[in-house]
């Protein structure tokens, strides 16, 4: 497996896609379909995390879109992402770093208020445009994120490359990987393109985020609006991204790193920047531990866990999802045993 090997999509495929797409959608693109085609590159042999079991990895490869569907999905995503956005004279790149379920969405909202022209790079946001998104959500909701992951990461890479070539401000959301590092972030390319790059890190304990991926999923299902962004993240992926951030933050320029904690209810739940003279890795570790402790002491974990259990029972959740929640509860018990004062 080698993420560096990529291939392009043919002009014949482009013409087929153009003939099937609504002219209004084509007109909404930030450049001509022909220009965008040059950025529509796909990995030939994508790297898949070692934490993914062999059967699921094979299914992920099997669910890759055809070139025609891939290009059509890219066009629809770009029409949405670049709508009413302006290019920048002095482009900036804001890199949002956190494990899955840590609350990157709230931090994203806060940063976008300062610069609404920013292009959001978030692979989950493009999945809803896949022609098979609804079918996958219906037949295998547990693995929706994984089955659509290869194409969505490639779409994110295509959109990033286009945005950089045209000097758009960027906001890249990343749940890092031990194997792949800052997925979708090429720091050297950003530097070469003249971007001022800053890192914004959410410091949230693993008990909170591991349960949050379940709570978020149940909330979306309860509202009756599952879509391409509705997924139950695999717990192994969550745990890997949690550990990866500990490693990666030590390699970043401390001057370019800002760390945030989750805001309380009295603070409007907005992310609060932590001002501390310590090294970023120390700030991250301390804030994570403190958030876990508060979550346990205030009864938050048991309350949310009970709520999720009731929701799962009500909808007769698949056994795989129940098993994953049981693993999260084991994490909680282990944490209690290792921290007797709690």
Model-derived features: where do they sit?
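N-terminal pre-Walker A segment at the start of P-loop NTPase domains
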Residues: 52-87
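Conserved nucleotide-sensing/catalytic segment adjacent to the nucleotide-binding pocket
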Residues: 118-188
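Conserved GTP-binding G-domain of TRAFAC-class P-loop NTPases and closely related GTPase folds
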Residues: 211-342
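Conserved glycine(s) of the Walker
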Residues: 103-104
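Hydrophobic positions on the alpha1 helix immediately C-terminal to the Walker A/P-loop
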Residues: 107, 111
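The conserved Walker
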Residues: 99-100
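Pre-Walker A (Motif I) flank of P-loop NTPase domains
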Residues: 88-94, 166-168
């Amino acid at each position: 497996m080698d993420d560096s090997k990529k291939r392009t999509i043919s002009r014949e495929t482009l013409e087929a896609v153009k003939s099937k797409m609504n002219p209004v959608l084509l007109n909404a693109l930030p450049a001509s379909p022909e220009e965008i085609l040059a950025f529509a590159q796909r990995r030939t042999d994508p790297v898949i995390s070692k934490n993914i079991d062999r059967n699921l990895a094979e299914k992920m490869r099997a669910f890759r879109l055809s070139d025609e569907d891939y290009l059509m999905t890219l066009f629809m995503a770009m029409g949405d992402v670049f709508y009413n956005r302006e290019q920048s004279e002095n482009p900036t790149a804001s890199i949002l770093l956190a494990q899955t379920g840590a609350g990157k969405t709230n931090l994203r909202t806060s940063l976008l208020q300062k610069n609404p022209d920013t292009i959001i790079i978030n692979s989950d946001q493009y999945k809803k445009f896949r022609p098979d998104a609804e079918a996958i959500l219906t037949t295998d909701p547990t693995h929706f994120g994984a089955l659509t992951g290869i194409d969505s990461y490639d779409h994110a890479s295509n959109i990033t490359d286009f945005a950089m070539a045209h000097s758009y401000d960027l906001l890249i959301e990343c749940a890092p990987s031990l194997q792949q590092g800052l997925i979708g972030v090429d720091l050297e390319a950003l530097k070469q393109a003249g971007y001022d790059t800053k890192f914004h890190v959410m410091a949230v304990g693993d008990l909170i985020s591991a349960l949050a991926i379940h709570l978020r999923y149940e909330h979306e299902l309860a509202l009756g609006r599952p879509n391409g962004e509705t997924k139950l993240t695999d717990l192994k992926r969550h745990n890997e991204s949690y550990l990866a951030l500990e490693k990666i933050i030590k390699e970043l320029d401390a001057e370019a790193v800002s760390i945030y904690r989750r805001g309380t209810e009295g603070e409007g739940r907005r992310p609060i920047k932590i001002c501390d003279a310590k090294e970023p890795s120390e700030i991250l570790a301390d804030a994570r531990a403190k958030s876990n402790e508060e979550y346990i002491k205030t009864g938050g974990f048991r309350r949310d866990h009970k709520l999720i259990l009731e929701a799962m029972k009500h909808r007769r959740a698949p056994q795989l999802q129940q098993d994953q929640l049981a693993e999260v509860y084991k994490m909680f018990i282990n944490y209690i045993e290792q921290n007797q004062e709690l």
